Amino acid sequence: NAAGEKFSITTLKYFVSNIKLKKADGSEYVVPQADSYFMVDGRDEDTRFAKVIVPEGNYTSVSFVLGVDSLQNYSPIEDRKGVLNLTTSSDMYWSWNSGYIFFKLEGTSPAINDSTGINIFRYHIGGFKDAMQNIREVNVNLNSGESAQVREGLRSNIHMLVDIKKVFDGTNSFSIAQYPTIMVNPFSMNISANFFEMFKHDHTENFAKVDGVF
């Protein structure tokens, strides 16, 4: 990272939700909430694809929330389906704090002064209230690669790059040695503010002949 610290990642998980796409004409399509919650797990390649059905059109940008909105955090537990089901996503939920962990990054770094020699860092970022508001809406411009040209019966694959170093080296850069563990802590807002810089459009594959999803 920018502080010159070496690190290795053991766990990377985060929620993506509330997906919206904007067309070249300025109109916007909001993916229905029921179809708009995904969890990415760095160790599971199958979770790296967020497949949603959208109307035909040329889409020039996509936005999404990195996290889980307050509506779902407050919803009855029995109504939480898919990746929000606490049976399957219990490691991404604070039962003692009644809220989802939006972003989890864990690993090791020799920069940490740990007498045990384990040298573990943990960043569990969540919270949606004013005192600790970590819900971030990320906007990604698709024009830098190629816009998504969705047509009936065809699929557009939008490829994004996720730069995890931006967690440490974004607008609010920090040292792992100084902050080896951040959970329910106001400093978490400094980290979540770096989420805006993590995502970059790489390229788009248009006109794949698979059912109109991307």
Predicted regions and their residues:
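A short, solvent-exposed, low-complexity linear motif enriched for acidic/polar residues
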Residues: 1-214
